[in-house]
From Swiss-Prot:
GO terms for molecular function: D-glucose binding; D-mannose binding. The keyword Repeat applies. PROSITE patterns: JACALIN_LECTIN. It comes from Parkia pendula (Inga pendula). This is Mannose/glucose-specific lectin. SUPFAM superfamilies: Mannose-binding lectins. Optimum pH for hemagglutinating activity is 5-7 with activity decreasing quickly at higher or lower pH. Expressed in seeds (at protein level).
Length: 447
């Protein structure tokens, strides 16, 4: 689940495998390989955790691209958005160019901006806390996870024209319950009521000869809530105004209202709750934008890691329930990878030594009736030319069963005496092997 964050995107093609990365601390470094397209991308956060590499699987040397490193000087600087383009490259629909926008500057554009479709996010008051997308030979698709900064709501938009005598701007304390739209060839006016009975507007509707036809959207608030909007804006009677609107909830799409014409807009957004609107109105609805907040503001607790200090730090947080764990093991744990029920694959953590990859083992978890609750295992010395302190064995405990142990139990044992929780993700250190491992659990856990 999207704990305290909102998913925007992805943009790009459908090739490659799903992946996602959510930083435990602020993102401080982005590493891309690029030439005529974005070959691969990886990330590092302020704690030193690295994400693994997404894309970059084309084995040809001339397709590796040039390395570009973006350093973000947190805490005075933080990443707030991205923009770029996607299009055809070697017969694949992939990310062609990328720019990274912070509160201080824009880094890029990297890649080729010629041809293809461009994308950007009209967003304010946000911090990028992670990325998601698809990757294979190249970076096929890319989106972001965002949180409000410092606390509260994120602003999207406005879309529409620059005119309008009356600016409006409101946020509700409950939920958007009723939306009253007057429309004809455009959106003449709009008004709102929240779950506490407070009314906002109407905004627009000052042409007495063209007030439009009234339509009403009613939202329950318990079973249904507003998550986003989409629409069009363009010329209407010589004014650049909002010409059509749709209101998207977790259940359905209401609309479109008005007449779709001109430039279209939409926000590919998940995990959101619309808490207010902003824009301008006059004769008609000149422009409109939304305030959103994460639907789920719950966080997680980090436990561990156990193991050695070698390798590089890594972390993985699932979008939904973890339903598959891929373990390569021999006399120790060589590598780990994860998959969740949204289809996202993690990077592979460990397994860098090509001469010692181990045997593949797969744990399948029948989520949601079965869910991961804890891990246990051992760590100690493992020798392959050099001596490493690594995770030597691992078991995975669910509410129904224990899977493992995998590897060979030796050295120091560890376990987590933990109840009534769900494992949301993993963290640790990895290089040639799995050097260390810990878990992220929900905050109501009793340890």
């Amino acid at each position: 689940q999207l704990k305290g964050m909102i998913s925007v995107g992805p943009w790009g093609g459908q090739g490659g495998d799903h992946w996602s990365f959510k930083a435990n601390h602020a993102i401080t470094e982005i590493l891309i390989h690029v030439k005529d397209n974005i070959k691969s991308i990886s990330f590092k956060d302020a704690s030193g955790d690295i994400s693994g590499t997404f894309g970059g699987k084309d084995p040809r040397e001339n397709e590796k691209g040039d390395e570009k490193k973006i350093g973000i000087h947190w805490p005075t600087e933080y990443l707030k958005s991205i923009s770029g383009s996607y299009g055809d490259y070697n017969g694949l629909l992939v990310i062609r160019s990328l720019s990274f926008i912070t509160n201080l500057t824009t880094y890029g554009s990297f890649g080729s901006t010629s041809g293809g479709e461009s994308f950007s996010i009209p967003i304010a008051d946000s911090v990028v806390v992670g990325f998601h997308g698809r990757g294979g030979y190249y970076l096929d698709a890319l989106g972001v996870f965002v949180k409000p900064v410092p606390h509260g709501t994120i602003s999207f938009g406005p879309w529409g024209g620059p005119a309008g005598d009356d600016a409006f701007n409101f946020k509700v304390g409950s939920w958007i319950k009723d939306i009253i739209i007057y429309s004809n060839g455009a959106i003449q006016s709009i008004a709102f009521k929240d779950g506490n009975g407070h009314c906002y507007g109407k905004f627009g509707g000052k042409d007495p000869n063209d007030i439009g036809v009234e339509k009403k959207v009613e939202i329950d608030g318990n079973l249904e809530h507003l998550t986003s909007i989409s629409g069009t804006y363009g010329n209407y009677k010589g004014f650049e105004v909002v010409t059509s609107l749709s209101f998207i909830t977790n259940v359905t799409k209401h609309g479109p209202f008005g007449t779709a014409s001109g430039t279209s807009f939409s926000i590919p957004i998940e995990g959101s709750l619309v808490t207010g609107f902003h824009g301008k109105g006059g004769y008609y609805l000149d422009s409109i934008g939304i305030y959103v907040k994460p639907r789920d503001v719950e966080g997680s607790i980090s436990i561990g890691p156990w193991g050695g200090s070698g390798g590089d730090p890594w972390s993985y947080t699932a979008n939904e329930g973890i339903n598959q764990i891929i373990i390569y093991a021999g006399s120790d744990i060589k590598s780990l990878a994860f998959k969740d029920t949204s289809g996202f694959d993690s990077a592979t953590f460990g397994g860098v030594n090509p001469k010692d990859t181990g045997e593949k083992n797969t744990v399948s978890i029948n989520w949601p009736s079965e869910y991961l609750t804890s891990i246990s295992g051992t760590y100690g010395q493992y020798k392959f030319k050099d001596v490493f302190t690594t995770i030597t064995s691992l078991s995975f405990t669910t509410n129904l069963a224990t899977y493992g142990p995998f590897g060979k139990a030796s050295g120091t044992s560890f376990s987590v005496p933990i109840n009534n929780n769900t494992v949301l993700g993993f963290h640790g250190r990895a290089g040639d092997y799995l050097d260390a491992i810990g878990i992220f659990v929900k905050p109501d856990t009793a340890v």
